[in-house]
Amino acid sequence: IGQNMEEIEVFKDDEFSYASMIGHLRMLMKLNRLNEDSIDILRNLSLLPVSGVYKSAFKMWLELDSLKNVNELIRYGIISEDTENKTIALHPLIQEVAIAETIPTVSDCHVMLNHLHLICLAHGLDVKRPVTVMECLKSINRHIILDNRAYYLLFLQDMYPYFDKYLDTDYLSELVERIEYVMNLMNDSGKSDETSKSYNSDKSGTPDITQETNHISACDKALLLDYKAQLLFPRKEYDNAIKKYKKAIALMENYHKTNTADARSANLLSNLHNNLSTAYLFRKKLEEAV
């Protein structure tokens, strides 16, 4: 495949046929002739932005021993390389074919997701190129196939503080909508009896991906209310934020009446009380803020 895919023109009855172009790309790429490692590289890269990702970062996220297969795909013209900026990417049309052919699911892309998840969890550390990481997270959210909703919900929840930290406030509302969407999917699925699958990444020390059940916990519901309340601050809707914080606190207090508090639930309840106090301060209700 040539580097400049925009020069390919396919016509049927003198009219441009988008479907024909995709069909020709499928034949040219011949994914069935690639080895499994190369297919996995395409599967993961298809989730990342077409603007490009650093080649060294991609190697680290996939825990590749070498870039041999990546370089071969570059030589074939399937992957585009910007040698000046040291980035790699897929052309948008090739990305579309790669997604359709390799089916990038949460489970199959767990190694890369674990590394990005760990970056989101490192709240106290500044990472290199945070904008690149955020663009990767946005692209993944657009293209990932959700075969493991329980893990991906946790991943989305942990993305919020990362975007908030680097002040990408424009994306926060979309991220909250995505969180709620996944929660609704899990609710619609009912209580699943699917067999658990666990993927460990001993080399990276990143979290396990475990498929349990489509169960929405009190923590999930309270955290969604917390994030929704935070979105109200720029609009100065402090009273609505206070209502959401109170509802979230009630959820967690009821949860603790029948369940032993763990680190997650205890920390969340503490943060909710702090955030409620902050909302009262913005509302200039100093007595309630104490």
Predicted features along the sequence, with ranges:
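Loop-to-helix "switch" segment enriched in basic
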Residues: I1-S38
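C-terminal boundary/linker of central alpha/beta nucleotide-binding cores
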Residues: L25-T102, C109-N114
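Extended alpha-helical scaffolding segments used for macromolecular assembly and cargo binding
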Residues: D108-D188, E212-C219, L223-L224
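Structural motif corresponding to the intra-repeat A-B loop/turn of tetratricopeptide repeats
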Residues: Y166-T169, R235, R283
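Hydrophobic/aromatic packing residues within the alpha-helices of TPR/SEL1-like helical repeat arrays
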Residues: V176-I179, Y245, M252
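Conserved alpha-helical positions within TPR/SEL1-like repeat arrays
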Residues: C219-P234, R264-F282
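Single-residue signature of alpha-solenoid repeat helices
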Residues: L172-L175, A241, A289
